[in-house]
Amino acid sequence: MKALILVGGYGTRLRPLTLSIPKPLADFCNKPILLHQVEALAAAGVDHVILAVSYMSQVLEKEMKAQEQKLGIRISMSHEEEPLGTAGPLALARDLLCETADPFFVLNSDVICDFPFEAMVQFHRHHGQEGSILVTKVEEPSKYGVVVCEADTGRVHRFVEKPQVFVSNKINAGVYILSPSVLRRIQLQPTSIEKEIFPVMAKEGQLYAMELQGFWMDIGQPKDFLTGMCLFLKSLRQKHPEQLCSGPGIVGNVLVDPRARIGENCSIGPNVSLGPGVVVEDGVCIRRCTVLRDAHIRSHSWLESCIVGWRCRVGQWVRMENVTVLGEDVIVNDELYLNGASVLPHKSIGESVPEPRIIM
């Protein structure tokens, strides 16, 4: 079985992290976002993953080719010369997707969830129509495009973009399984599968929705990245608690790479991820943060709701909060306060940032 993952975007919403690396390779809970998806697909029996690539495609190809042998699957690249939206890449990869008559998965690269791939295959085969989409319930459906479907069968009737009155609290979760016949509906041109293809399929009774029972988050921007981390760690606590850290100074769900080092009298957690090579000196407090590979947090600093990029250096007695994001190789000098700062790579910060802003 095959899967196509849409990884061609520029990742602008997740800057400054994506100024150094394509978004699918950004570390989420100590593993590239893309690898979370590919590993889940492989575990469900997918043996061929096609990446619809554009931005930084050579970096993506090099990294994922290294994963082919480890995972025992085939990984192919489908190169977009121009942006093709969310449906055009399927037409571009038509020859690869149609090598067999089996249905195939399509994923948005921003999605992290309890991927129910095996259940989706069963659901798709049961209803026997062209397409199945994963939907998830949200508290504020007016912020999204919602899916109106039958409660018992899942048959999709229509899509409503950002409704002002309640029609449904189920939204498109960005994970699909499609029969090859769907490709006849798609031309090789910029096309939206959500706005141009799915509504027609729904009108013809060819589209069904399966509700996700576990967690879900689109982690394409920093605040949602951190929320997704919290949900992922909660799920990890339920399924694989042995992977989480415990011991003195560890509070709640904390994921620590074995190659990270934590000093004495620290308070780490809840909801923290520390990557390989991270050094946390004595007396540091970290809450609801992800600290990426080889970053160094000096003594007595206090971090909450932050993303600390690769190889950053945070000085002593620093306070950072309110979704502060440090790009790669940023230096924050001692005794500074950063409130909602977004700092581009390779900058040295010598004064406090009391109000949210971009540091270029």
Swiss-Prot record:
It catalyses: alpha-D-mannose 1-phosphate + GTP + H(+) = GDP-alpha-D-mannose + diphosphate. It holds the Pfam family NTP_transferase. Enzyme activity is reduced by incorporation into the GMPPA-GMPPB mannose-1-phosphate guanylyltransferase complex. Allosterically inhibited, when part of the GMPPA-GMPPB complex, by GDP-alpha-D-mannose binding to GMPPA. GO terms for cellular component: cytoplasm; GDP-mannose pyrophosphorylase complex. Pathway: Nucleotide-sugar biosynthesis; GDP-alpha-D-mannose biosynthesis; GDP-alpha-D-mannose from alpha-D-mannose 1-phosphate (GTP route): step 1/1. Gene3D superfamilies: Hexapeptide repeat proteins, Spore Coat Polysaccharide Biosynthesis Protein SpsA, Chain A. GDP-alpha-D-mannose binds at residues 110, 218. Its EC number is 2.7.7.13. Coordinates binding with substrate and required for enzymatic activity. Residues 2-222 are annotated as: Substrate-binding domain. Mg(2+) binds at residues 110, 218. The keyword GTP-binding applies. Residues 245-360 are annotated as: Hexapeptide repeat domain. GO terms for biological process: GDP-mannose biosynthetic process; protein glycosylation. Its cofactor is Mg(2+). One of its GO terms (molecular function) is GTP binding. The keyword Nuclease does not apply. It comes from the Eukaryota. It is an enzyme of class 2 (transferase). The N-terminal substrate-binding domain adopts a Rossman-like fold and has a binding pocket for GTP or GDP-alpha-D-mannose. Substrate binding is coordinated by an Mg(2+) ion. Catalytic subunit of the GMPPA-GMPPB mannose-1-phosphate guanylyltransferase complex. Catalyzes the formation of GDP-mannose, an essential precursor of glycan moieties of glycoproteins and glycolipids. Can catalyze the reverse reaction in vitro. Together with GMPPA regulates GDP-alpha-D-mannose levels. Component of the GMPPA-GMPPB mannose-1-phosphate guanylyltransferase complex composed of 4 GMPPA subunits and 8 GMPPB subunits; the complex is organized into three layers, a central layer made up of 2 GMPPA dimers sandwiched between two layers each made up of 2 GMPPB dimers. GMPPB catalytic activity is reduced when part of the complex and binding of GDP-alpha-D-Mannose by GMPPA induces allosteric feedback inhibition of GMPPB. Belongs to the transferase hexapeptide repeat family. This is Mannose-1-phosphate guanylyltransferase catalytic subunit beta. It comes from Bos taurus.
